Swiss-Prot record:
Cofactor names: Co(2+); Zn(2+); Mn(2+); Fe(2+)
Biased composition regions of type Acidic residues, renumbered to the chain: 37-51
Organism: Pyrenophora teres f. teres (strain 0-1)
Family, as annotated: Belongs to the peptidase M24A family. Methionine aminopeptidase eukaryotic type 2 subfamily.
Cofactor binding summary note: Binds 2 divalent metal cations per subunit. Has a high-affinity and a low affinity metal-binding site. The true nature of the physiological cofactor is under debate. The enzyme is active with cobalt, zinc, manganese or divalent iron ions. Most likely, methionine aminopeptidases function as mononuclear Fe(2+)-metalloproteases under physiological conditions, and the catalytically relevant metal-binding site has been assigned to the histidine-containing high-affinity site.
Ligand binding (a divalent metal cation 2): D236, H305, E338, E433
Matching PROSITE patterns: MAP_2
Binding site for substrate: H205, H313
Alphabetized SUPFAM superfamilies for the sequence: Creatinase/aminopeptidase, Winged helix' DNA-binding domain
Name of the molecule in the record: Methionine aminopeptidase 2-1
Biased composition (Basic residues): 60-73
Binding of a divalent metal cation 1, residues: D225, D236, E433
Length: 452
């Protein structure tokens, strides 16, 4: 289009050559839009000074062909460009980033024997071929960042856990553009797993069921753990929220330990080495609560994990204490390193009412005698597949009186139940988690943000 406008202006200059020389900009082929208004103002002056009739005609002709349409088109393009996110987040992320060009995560170079990967041409070629799945991961990571950064400002003491969980989940669904109510819609994009809101001695896997009246108080330590997925690429990240600065050292211990684990991670690195690095950092911290100095302990039976396609726990575990697993990380794998610190025993057990569930990828085919179990299994398969879900999600989809059928699926080994995991009462636990991918040339910490 720009070329066409330039030709029109050049023709006008030739027509007007008897009254005024063509501008140097037009002769040199510069963009006409920058000089269009200047040329028209010159023509107006000539008309006022009694320029010949031919000159007036040329001036009028030029004014008629003034490239207003181009300006209008530019304005329309601006109106249809990137939008600004709202609070609470409700603008689809592909409207904030209309070209599907999402921010890259934090890049960490490989070290020691893997340092050559940064400059190796073959590895760089492989890296360039991975853009499709990385775009999906980065999209999910950006949604996670925008939702959690809003949530950290929004959550206040006295708010109910149900309100908090639904606020986060509604925001994720709005940004993905998938409400998860139609068959299969939740498997296209949306929640990677239910929002965990585990308070104080409860370390993980707690989300409110229907009718829950719990609130978060000023003196509480709440772990906020939620996932976002795009076409089964799950971004898993968690932070600990407090209102009382007395717990800062507990939170800082987990953040530092998670960063140490990510730094140690890499292709061909043994899981046990990562666990040792995490424990060394975590247990170097202490926290003073109510006048008592307490050591921060790793919760030794909680781990990080690999992430598979539509599978939050991909088969490999990343310990947060030394010893144990000698399995190595491999190129192309995605991991969530999550660390848990505790002022209690540093060991969790199943406790409280179960809310988290997931269908097993290798679920056995067994005869179900409870009719509600058959109906529920069909719905779970269509709507969640192997993605974790909670009872609130079943309520939201219109299921009722499903608990007998759900328990039947659990006892049959088709669905796995994930009860809350708790340390001793009176203790405080914290969590920090990031998702990263082992690219051929570097580690990309997908979920890294300005907040953590």
């Amino acid at each position: 289009m720009a070329a066409k406008v330039a030709d029109d202006v050049a023709n006008l200059k030739l027509d007007d050559s008897n009254t005024k020389p063509a501008s140097g900009a037009a002769e040199n082929g510069d963009k006409p839009t920058g000089d269009a208004e200047h040329d028209d103002s010159d023509d107006d002056n000539e008309a006022e000074d009694g320029a010949p009739e031919a000159g007036e005609g040329a001036a009028k002709k030029k004014k008629k062909r003034k490239p207003r349409k181009k300006k209008k088109a530019a304005g329309a393009a601006g109106a249809g460009g990137a939008k600004v996110q709202t609070a609470p987040p409700r603008v689809r992320i592909d409207e904030v980033f209309p070209n599907d060009s999402y921010p890259e995560g934090e890049i960490q170079e490989y070290v020691n024997e893997n340092a050559y990967r940064t400059t190796n041409e073959e590895k760089r070629h492989l890296d360039r071929m991975n853009n499709d799945f990385l775009t999906e991961y980065r999209k999910g990571a950006e949604i996670h960042r925008e939702v959690r950064q809003w949530a950290q400002k929004w959550i206040k003491p006295g708010m109910g856990l149900t309100e908090i969980a639904e606020g986060i989940e509604d925001s994720v669904r709005a940004l993905t553009g998938h409400q998860g109510l139609g068959n299969g819609d939740a498997q296209i994009a949306g929640m990677g797993f239910p929002t965990g809101l585990s308070i104080n001695h409860c370390a993980a896997h707690y989300t409110p069921n229907a009718g829950n009246k719990m609130v978060v108080n000023y003196e509480d330590v709440m772990k906020v753990d939620f996932g976002v997925h795009i076409n089964g690429r799950i971004v898993d990240s968690a932070f600990t929220l407090t209102f009382d600065p007395v717990y800062d050292n507990l939170i800082n211990a987990c953040k530092a330990a998670t960063n140490a684990g990510i730094k140690e991670a890499g292709i061909d690195v043994r899981m046990s080495d990562i666990g040792a690095a995490i424990q060394e950092v975590m247990e170097s911290y202490e926290v003073e609560i109510k006048g008592e100095m307490l050591p921060v302990k790793c919760i030794r039976n909680l781990n990080g994990h690999s992430i598979g396609h539509y599978t939050i726990h991909g088969g490999k575990t990343v310990p947060i204490v030394k010893g144990g697993d000698q399995t190595k990380m491999e190129e192309g794998e995605t991991f969530a390193i999550e660390t848990f610190g505790s002022t209690g025993k540093g060991y969790v057990r199943d406790d409280m009412e179960t809310s988290h569930y997931a269908m097993k990828a290798d679920a056995p085919k067994v005869a179900l005698r409870v009719s509600s179990a058959k109906t529920l299994l069909s719905s779970i398969t269509k709507n969640f597949g192997t993605l974790p879900f909670c009872r609130r999600y079943l309520d939201r989809m219109g299921h009722d009186k499903y608990l007998l059928g759900l328990n039947n699926l659990v006892s049959a080994g088709i669905v796995e139940a994930y009860p809350p995991l708790c340390d001793i009462k009176g203790s405080y636990t914290a969590q920090s988690e990031h998702t990263f991918v082992l690219r051929p040339t570097c580690k990309e910490v997908l979920s890294r943000g300005d907040d953590y």
